[in-house]
């Protein structure tokens, strides 16, 4: 695949960064299925597109690991990151939960999943195997602080002591987790974080992330966090 770089000739922010944006999953491996019967990859692509435009308008340079219809391996994502010279690798995802918390139903005759109990909010992951772990934490913390200022709380369900979860919480107030084995984080040689924007199996949270004004507020928070760090 060929990654692409885009910039806008606009007034620069106080510091101009190169941000490697990684839209999680692909059309062939579309990720979680939400309560609206929409796959995660759709939300990832939309969020990355809007975030990319906001970053460029703020004077940052953006590199993408893939285009919306491209297929790409996890190793290739890390390879692109390591060749990019970027200041930050930011992988964008939308969250689900373990099946014990979910029930299946249909939306317009299409299968969908929803949570039985509220599971709402963002979460941010880092890997201590990343060679710039402390820098990764600093970026993660800055983004989390800005999201919290919006009134957006983190979800802590990934710390539940059940199969498939039990992730180490580095900061429960900010929703920061350590997940060492995440390949796109541990194999990158630049600061790297994975952001779960919201929980799409929770009907209320999916409605939140599906609303453009809410996405714009979160994206603005992320861009401001780059100046904070």
Across the structure, where does each feature detected by a protein language model lie?
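Short acidic/polar micro-motifs centered on Gly/Asp/Asn
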Residues: 22-28
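Boundary at the C-terminal end of the N-terminal hydrophobic targeting segment
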Residues: 9-13
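Active-site-proximal helix/loop segments of hydrolytic enzymes
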Residues: 14, 42-229
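Nucleotide donor/acceptor-binding cores
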Residues: 16-19
């Amino acid at each position: 695949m060929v990654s692409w770089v885009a910039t806008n000739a606009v007034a620069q922010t106080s510091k101009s960064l190169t941000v490697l944006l990684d839209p999680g999953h692909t059309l062939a491996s579309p990720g979680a299925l939400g309560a609206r019967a929409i796959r995660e990859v759709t939300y990832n692509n939309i969020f990355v597109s809007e975030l990319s435009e906001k970053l460029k308008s703020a004077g940052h340079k953006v590199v993408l690991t893939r285009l919306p219809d491209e297929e790409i391996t996890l190793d290739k994502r890390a390879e692109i990151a390591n060749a990019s010279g970027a200041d930050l690798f930011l992988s964008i995802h939308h969250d689900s939960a373990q099946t014990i918390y979910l029930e299946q139903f249909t939306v317009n005759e299409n299968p969908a999943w929803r949570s039985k109990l509220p599971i709402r909010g963002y979460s941010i992951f880092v890997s201590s195997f990343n060679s710039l772990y402390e820098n990764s934490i600093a970026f993660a913390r800055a983004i989390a602080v800005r999201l919290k200022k919006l009134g957006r709380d983190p979800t802590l369900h990934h710390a539940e002591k059940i199969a498939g979860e039990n992730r180490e919480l580095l900061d429960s107030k900010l929703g920061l987790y350590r997940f060492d084995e995440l390949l796109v984080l541990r194999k990158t040689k630049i600061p790297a974080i994975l952001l779960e924007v919201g929980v799409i199996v929770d009907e209320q949270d999916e409605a939140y992330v599906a609303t453009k004004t809410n996405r714009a507020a979160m994206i603005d928070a992320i861009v401001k966090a780059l100046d904070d760090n």
